C-alpha cells in the first residue's frame, strides 16, 4: 500500500510539474496578509518564529525542540476541519478515531493514554487538559480550526517548560485576534456550518468575537459484531458550537472560549456497542477565560502575569447490557430493555502564574516562571435507567427499568453481584488537587553558529509526589541553509484523578493511590539542509519510558466480575526516524512530503510506518490542494495460549483529500472540499478490546462553502 501511494505521488508530481512550467506567475490574493508556509521561499521558511519551544519568540530553525507549524493560510488551503485532521500531517504523529467521544493521538509509536493524556494541549498558551482523565480530548474533541491563526506542535518532551502531561508532545493553538468575516458551508451527510468573526477597535482597545455552529447527520456504517455477539448498525451524527472572544487594552489581554460538542450513536467503549437511538452519546461543554498582563520592567526584562480558569461538563451515556441479556440477569421483571448507564462529570481549574525573560547580554537570555494550579472535580455519580425508588422500597430485591426516556442519578448496588446499600456508590467522590511548579532556562549563544539551551523545572503535586525535569540542547548552524540539533529532555505525566482516586468496583475499575508518575527520557538528533529549491529534514529519536501506567486485570474485588486497575508496569522503549521534504518547484507550486518509520513501538496499537503529503498550486485567484496520509499495518491484538489463536492485524491504508478555492473578489471566496477523496473503506485501531478489527471511518464527504470578508 505504501509503495502504491508513493507511485501515485510521483505520478502527480510529474503531471503537476509539467503544468506548472506553463502556468502564470501570479499569486493568489492574500487579502488578510496571512502567512502561507506552503508558498514561502525556503529562506522565509527558516525565519518563521515560534514561541512554544522556549516561551520566547525565536526562529523555528534555532528552536531547541523538534517543532512543526501550521498557519491559517495552510489550514484553509488544505481543508483541515479540526485539530485531529491536522495532526495527521505532523511528522511522527497521527490521530485515531476511538469511540463516540472522539479520537486518540499516537506520537512516535506510543499511544498517549486515556483521552490522550500524554500530550499537553494549550489554547492561546493556557493549559487545556482536564484533571479527571489528564488529557484534553475528552472536552476538546474535534476542536474546530475555523478561527485558528496557527498551530505549533512540539514533537517530543516539554515538561521542563510546561510540567505534567507534556510527556511526548505539546500543542499550542492560537486563535485569530482580527478579521471581519462570515462563513457558510453545506455538504453531504446533512453537513451544515455557519459562522462569523467581528472585530472592533475603540481607541486603545481592541475586541473581537467569533461564533460558529456546525452539524451533520452522520455516516451510515455496515453492521458489525459487538462484545455480546450482536450484529448491529450505527451512525455518527455530530453537533459543534464554538464561541471565542478577545479583548485587549494596553498591556492587558483577555481570551475567552466556549466549546460545546455532542457526538452521538457510533460506538461505545463499554462493550463496543453501536446505536441508532441516541442511547450512546458523549456531550461536552467547556468555558475558559485567560487573563494576561505584560510588563516591560526594563529594556532587558519582560514579565507576564497570567490568570487562567476553565469549567467543564462531560456527559456520557452507553448501553451497558443489551436487552436480551439484561432481561435474564438484570431486570427482575424480565423486561426486554437495554440496561443503560453513564455519568456526568463537572470540574474546574484555576491557575495563577508568572513568566519572564531577562536578557543578560546580547547573547544570553534567562527565562523563568512559576505557577500555582488548583484542579477540582465534583462528585461523579452513575446515571442509569434503573428504578431506584422501587429498589429502595424492596430493600434491594427488585431491580426494574424506568419508563423509556427516564433515568436516575446514583448507584446503590443490587446488581453485578454488588450488595444493595442505602449509601450511594460514587464513581469518583468530589476531589481537588493543588500543584506548585517553577522553571528556569538559559539560552546562550556560544558563537554566531552555536547556541546552547539548558532548563530545569520542579513540580509538586500534593497527592502524587514531586518531579524534576531537565532539558538541554545544542543548535549548530555552520552555514546558511544548514541546521544541526542535538536534544535531550526529561518529561513526565502525573496520574490523573481518575487513575489515582479511582472509579468504584461497580464499574469494573478501581483507582490506585500507590501510582507513581510515568516518566520518559528522550534523545533527539536532527539535520536540516537546503539544496537549491528543496529543504530536507531528518530527525532520529529514542524514548525510554519508566513506570508506564497501564490498566491491568487484578483479583476479583466483586466475585464473578472482572476488575481492572491502573498500575506502573515498568519500562518501554520507542525509537525511530522522521523525514520531511519541502520542494518549491516554482513560485506557484510547492510540495511537502513526510515519512516516519519507528523501529520500536508499543507492542499493540501503533503503526511502524506513517506518511503524509501535500501538493499546493495557486494562481492569482485559484488555489488547488491535494493532500493525504498513509497508515501502515497495526497489530491490534496478540494471540495467547488460551482464547486468541492468531494475531489480529488492521491493514494499511492511504487517505486522500482535496480542496479547491476561488477568489471571486478580494472580499468573497468560494471553495469545495472532498474528504476521503476516493471513497475508501477502512478501519483504524481502537482501545476497545471487544473490537480487534478496529472501528470504521467515514466514507467520502463533499463540502462547498463561501467566506465573505467585510
Task: Describe each region flagged by the PLM.
Residues 83-86, 103-108, 119-124, 138-141, ...:
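N-terminal periplasmic accessory domains that precede
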Residues 275-296, 427-433, 477, 483, ...:
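Outer-membrane beta-barrel signature, preferentially recognizing the C-terminal barrel domain
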Residues 51-52, 56-67, 84, 88-127:
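Extracytoplasmic beta-strand/coil segments of soluble accessory domains associated
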Residues 246-262, 283-466, 477, 537-538, ...:
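Face-selective signature of the C-terminal outer-membrane beta-barrel domain
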Residues 160, 172, 179-180, 185, ...:
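Periplasmic-side early beta-strands and strand-to-turn transitions of outer-membrane beta-barrels
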Residues 127-155:
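Short acidic/polar hinge/loop motifs at secondary-structure boundaries
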Residues 199-201, 241-243, 248, 282, ...:
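Conserved C-terminal beta-signal and adjacent last beta-strands/turns
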Amino acid at each position: 500500500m505504501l509503495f502504491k501511494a508513493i507511485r501515485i505521488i510521483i505520478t502527480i508530481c510529474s503531471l503537476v510539474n509539467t503544468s506548472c512550467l506553463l502556468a502564470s506567475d501570479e499569486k493568489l490574493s492574500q487579502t488578510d496578509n496571512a502567512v502561507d508556509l506552503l508558498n514561502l521561499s525556503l529562506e522565509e521558511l527558516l525565519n518563521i518564529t515560534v514561541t512554544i519551544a522556549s516561551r520566547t519568540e525565536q526562529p523555528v530553525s534555532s528552536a531547541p525542540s523538534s517543532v512543526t507549524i501550521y498557519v491559517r493560510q495552510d489550514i484553509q488551503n488544505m481543508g483541515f476541519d479540526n485539530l485531529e485532521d491536522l495532526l495527521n500531517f505532523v511528522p511522527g504523529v497521527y490521530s485515531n478515531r476511538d469511540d463516540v467521544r472522539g479520537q486518540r493521538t499516537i506520537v512516535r509509536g506510543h499511544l498517549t493514554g486515556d483521552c490522550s493524556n500524554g500530550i499537553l494541549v494549550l489554547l492561546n498558551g493556557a493549559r487545556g487538559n482536564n484533571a479527571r482523565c489528564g488529557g484534553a480530548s475528552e472536552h476538546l474533541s474535534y476542536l474546530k480550526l475555523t478561527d485558528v491563526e496557527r498551530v505549533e506542535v512540539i514533537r517530543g518532551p516539554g515538561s521542563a517548560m510546561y510540567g505534567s502531561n507534556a510527556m511526548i508532545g505539546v500543542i499550542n493553538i492560537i486563535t485569530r485576534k482580527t478579521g471581519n468575516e462570515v462563513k457558510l458551508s453545506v455538504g453531504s451527510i446533512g453537513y451544515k456550518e455557519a459562522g462569523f468573526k467581528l472585530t472592533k477597535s475603540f481607541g486603545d482597545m481592541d475586541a473581537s468575537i467569533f461564533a460558529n455552529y456546525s452539524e451533520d447527520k452522520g455516516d451510515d456504517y455496515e453492521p458489525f459484531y459487538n462484545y455480546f455477539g450482536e450484529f448491529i448498525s450505527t451512525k455518527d451524527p455530530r453537533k459543534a458550537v464554538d464561541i471565542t472572544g478577545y479583548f485587549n487594552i494596553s498591556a492587558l489581554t483577555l481570551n475567552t472560549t466556549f466549546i460545546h460538542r455532542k457526538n452521538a450513536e457510533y460506538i461505545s467503549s463499554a462493550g463496543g456497542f453501536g446505536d441508532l437511538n441516541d442511547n450512546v452519546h458523549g456531550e461536552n461543554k467547556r468555558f475558559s477565560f485567560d487573563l494576561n498582563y505584560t510588563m516591560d520592567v526594563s529594556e532587558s526584562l519582560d514579565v507576564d502575569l497570567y490568570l487562567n480558569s476553565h469549567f467543564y461538563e462531560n456527559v456520557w451515556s452507553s448501553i451497558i447490557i443489551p436487552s436480551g441479556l439484561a432481561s435474564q440477569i438484570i431486570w427482575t421483571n424480565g423486561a426486554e430493555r437495554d440496561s443503560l448507564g453513564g455519568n456526568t462529570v463537572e470540574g474546574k481549574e484555576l491557575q495563577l502564574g508568572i513568566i519572564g525573560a531577562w536578557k543578560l547580554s546580547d547573547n544570553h537570555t534567562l527565562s523563568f516562571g512559576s505557577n500555582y494550579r488548583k484542579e477540582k472535580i465534583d462528585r461523579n455519580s452513575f446515571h442509569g435507567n434503573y428504578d431506584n425508588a422501587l429498589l429502595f422500597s424492596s430493600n434491594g430485591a427488585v431491580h426494574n427499568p424506568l419508563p423509556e426516556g427516564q433515568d436516575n442519578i446514583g448507584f446503590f448496588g443490587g446488581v453485578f453481584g454488588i450488595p444493595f446499600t442505602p449509601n450511594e456508590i460514587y464513581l469518583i467522590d468530589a476531589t481537588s488537587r493543588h500543584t506548585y511548579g517553577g522553571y528556569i532556562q538559559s539560552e546562550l549563544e556560544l558563537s554566531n553558529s552555536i547556541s546552547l539551551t539548558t532548563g530545569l523545572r520542579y513540580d509538586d503535586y500534593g497527592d502524587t509526589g514531586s518531579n524534576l525535569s531537565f532539558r538541554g540542547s545544542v543548535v549548530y548552524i555552520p552555514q546558511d541553509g544548514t541546521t544541526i540539533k542535538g536534544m535531550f529532555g526529561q518529561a513526565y505525566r502525573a496520574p490523573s484523578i481518575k487513575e489515582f482516586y479511582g472509579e468504584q468496583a461497580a464499574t469494573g475499575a478501581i483507582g490506585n493511590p500507590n501510582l507513581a508518575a510515568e516518566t520518559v527520557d528522550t534523545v533527539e538528533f536532527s539535520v536540516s539542509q537546503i539544496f537549491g529549491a528543496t529543504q530536507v529534514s531528518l530527525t532520529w529519536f529514542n524514548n525510554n519510558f519508566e513506570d508506564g501506567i497501564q490498566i491491568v486485570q487484578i483479583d476479583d474485588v466483586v466475585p464473578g466480575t472482572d476488575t481492572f486497575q491502573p498500575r506502573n508496569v515498568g519500562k518501554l522503549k520507542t525509537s525511530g526516524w522522521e523525514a520531511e521534504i519541502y520542494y518549491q518547484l516554482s513560485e506557484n507550486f510547492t510540495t511537502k512530503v513526510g515519512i516516519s518509520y519507528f523501529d520500536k513501538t508499543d507492542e499493540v496499537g501503533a503503526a511502524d510506518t506513517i506518511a503524509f503529503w501535500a501538493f499546493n498550486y495557486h494562481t492569482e485567484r485559484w488555489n488547488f490542494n491535494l493532500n493525504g496520509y498513509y497508515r501502515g499495518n497495526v497489530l491490534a491484538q496478540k494471540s495467547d495460549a488460551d482464547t486468541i489463536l492468531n494475531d489480529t492485524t488492521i491493514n494499511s491504508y492511504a487517505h486522500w483529500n482535496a480542496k479547491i478555492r476561488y477568489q471571486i473578489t478580494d472580499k468573497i471566496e468560494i471553495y469545495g472540499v472532498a474528504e476521503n477523496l476516493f471513497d475508501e473503506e477502512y478501519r483504524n485501531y481502537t482501545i476497545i478490546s471487544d473490537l480487534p478489527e478496529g472501528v470504521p471511518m467515514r466514507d467520502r464527504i463533499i463540502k462547498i462553502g463561501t467566506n465573505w470578508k467585510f
